[in-house]
């Protein structure tokens, strides 16, 4: 499977532009999966640019009553660049007019290096049956240091905060009377994320038929409502295309942020007639339909 994604958050502010690509495959005989993930993220018209590349490995342990446990680990390398010349400091602002001159000069000390390189380690576990799943993941376990400000040759940053996420949900078959061609289902699900002092909850449902799919979620942070998310897409054979939009419902909506647009394209080779006819022989992806 190959996935391509792009996300534009708060486009009215030129805030975040994110591009990602990934590949994963499953080796049935080894009960294992391998994957590769690359990401490029641009914040504030290039004030901060982040690039990452990560390798993934997972292992499936079969249990009783059709339950499985999947263990996964992710090892990666990241690079963060700070465009110092785009920053505006207090001593560059005219105290009377508030203007910033192109020729203004700041006495802020320019860091010796504007680039930070770091390693990243993550892991997770997923319990799943044919209709229910629950998972826990830990990201940035080693807290790689992505800061550039030095104090006595040590970076002031304490590293990337540990991210803990929990997810659980169910998959309900909507074609129980026609199990041979059962493709339609609905999946209510919840995602809880905690990183540093920040936390949020996503709750909603994903629905899919043989050709179209969609979903709706509500995202709430620890202190306020954040966004309502709607998604719609089409799928046929190996091809899957989805679009989602985040409707801002926080106080930020007063500033016409533009919400967030996300487009995702997947090429699911395990859904081709060739691989379906040889599912036991070749490397078909073995998971709930929700994750395909």
Predicted regions and their residues:
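Subset of outer-membrane beta-barrel
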Residues: 1-292
